Amino acid sequence: MIGYLRGLAVIVEDVEFARRLYKEGFYGRFLGYDKVKRDEVEKINAPLILGLYEALYLAEKGRLKVMGEDGREVAPEELAALGRERMRNFDEIYKIYKYFRDLGYVVKSGLKFGALFSVYEKGPGIDHAPMVVVFLEPDKGISATDITRGGRLSHSVRKTWTLATVLRQTGEVVLLGFGWARL
């Protein structure tokens, strides 16, 4: 099916296809709607807005054909190039997104938790995200204060605060999770 590239988003106008994408993996968000539970999807009559990470992932999997404003198909490599051009650390962050998606997790924005991603086992409205993921730039450190802040945040929302990075030498995704424990 088709999505239309608009800036750094891809719009899926075909409502039936949009519903299917959302039901199958909670991809994107419906225009004008905040949170939509799986059993409410059939009532939605709005386009689906996909972020660049989601659109690239679906295009690489052959589930989505992205069309540019000029009417020509935008290849996954071109989507990645656009991301690199407009977003800092695009390749590393996409690799982390893809890592979780390939493991079967649902990956949504973690902005409301001060994180890059919220990662669900089943999906929003079905379960709570067990972890929030923060991107740590390769070769950069993190302060003890930042770790404490992340740990406190994750404790208050009952989630594992997870640092994620990509090793420059191997391209491997590395995760480090923090949680609170009563001693």
UniProtKB/Swiss-Prot annotation:
It comes from the Archaea. It is an enzyme of class 4 (lyase). Coiled coil: none annotated. Gene3D superfamilies: 3.40.1350.10, tRNA intron endonuclease, N-terminal domain. It catalyses: pretRNA = a 3'-half-tRNA molecule with a 5'-OH end + a 5'-half-tRNA molecule with a 2',3'-cyclic phosphate end + an intron with a 2',3'-cyclic phosphate and a 5'-hydroxyl terminus. Its EC number is 4.6.1.16. The keyword Lyase applies. GO terms for biological process: tRNA processing; tRNA splicing, via endonucleolytic cleavage and ligation. The active site is at residues 120, 128, 159. One of its GO terms (cellular component) is cytoplasm. Keywords: Lyase, tRNA processing. One of its GO terms (molecular function) is nucleic acid binding. Pfam families: tRNA_int_endo, tRNA_int_endo_N. Belongs to the tRNA-intron endonuclease family. Archaeal short subfamily. Homotetramer; although the tetramer contains four active sites, only two participate in the cleavage. Therefore, it should be considered as a dimer of dimers. Endonuclease that removes tRNA introns. Cleaves pre-tRNA at the 5'- and 3'-splice sites to release the intron. The products are an intron and two tRNA half-molecules bearing 2',3' cyclic phosphate and 5'-OH termini. Recognizes a pseudosymmetric substrate in which 2 bulged loops of 3 bases are separated by a stem of 4 bp. PANTHER family: TRNA-SPLICING ENDONUCLEASE SUBUNIT SEN2. This is tRNA-splicing endonuclease. It comes from Pyrobaculum aerophilum (strain ATCC 51768 / DSM 7523 / JCM 9630 / CIP 104966 / NBRC 100827 / IM2).
